[in-house]
Amino acid sequence: MSIYERLGVKPIINANASATRLGGSLFAPPVIDAMREASQSFVDMYQLQEAVSRRVAELTRNEDAFVCAGAAAGLVLGTLACMSGSDMGLVARLHRHGAAALPRHEVIIHCGSRNPYDLAINLAGAQIIQIGNVWQTLPWELEGAISERTAAVLYLPGPDWGKGALPLDQVLDTAHARGVPVIVDAAAQLPPAENLWRFTQQGADLAVFSGGKRIQGPQSTGILVGKRELIGACSIHASPHEGLGRPMKVGKEELVGLLVALEWFLEQDQDAATKTAERITQEWIDVLNGLPGVTATRDFPGESGRLIPRAIVEFAPALGYTSEEIRMAMLDGEPAIDTALAGERSIYLNAETLEPGEDVPVLRKLCSIAARPHSGSKKLKESRQ
């Protein structure tokens, strides 16, 4: 009996994304052995964090790096670093009186980039200053928002989160002209692997990536890369120091697991993985378009604007399903399959997070749902209670 069976928790086929609520990703092959080995010895955590971060910086072609407890923790630490730098007087003031007591405690974000994850900025104590609207941002809006209180500009790349935003190059030029650092939230911007160094080579002062998504390391890890002085300031606030970031602790097993996963990720043929996703997506589309009342199309870029395709599957009104009812029907019974909501009567299917062979039951179950009479949302909801 598996650990999940003992706990009464049902495993899920993930046709959605490397989402936190689904466990992020499955470990890369060498990760478990590396974490087990790391768990067998005590070690100086300062020394281990420094050694792992140095190797991560080398692998990602960055000036410096820091392994944190997920991308959200990276945003907290990055914001703290931009507010205080390595000035221990400011760090002490932050601890005693909060971020509002610091000279720089504001972070600028484009309106179209607002999302639930920017709560990490508030968690650091910073005040968010919003610019533009969901359609556009004019250059003078960024220029006017920057003041002596500005600690950083947070930038989210990609079509999903960058709606109405100024181009990154323009943001970098404007911010740097006023001495303001730019943080790029690239949590889900892998692949391509080149993004690990593209944003910083473009001029970003810090970039944040998840370690538990496409890298396939521990879900509780993330990577901060960028300028050495800011990475050093991040480490002041982080565990094992007694700073505000101490609760966001990364254990020795996670540090080693992340490093090994990153080494593995950079050795993989990303084009081959993309081609596999393309093949499965097209196979789904071909079959589903042969079903009465079902329309399937290719969506690219995919989730979070990444260079991985998805299928958008839409049910005709005559089939009687809403998108939520399709999703619930996919989760109901065996196997349980998680998908993402798209439009009013449509869902996304993502092949990237599937294990070999799982594309078949995904297609089979969706075909079965489309072929049977609509059972009503009430019955579906009751079956999940």
What are these regions (language model features)?
Residues 36-48, 223-224:
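An acidic intrinsically disordered interaction segment
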Residues 40, 207, 316:
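Glycine-rich tight-turn/loop motif centered on a GG-T
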Residues 45-50, 64-65, 245-249, 268-277, ...:
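Flexible, glycine/charged-enriched surface loops at secondary-structure junctions
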Residues 264-270, 347, 352:
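Glycine-rich phosphate/diphosphate-binding loops and the adjacent beta-loop-alpha structural elements
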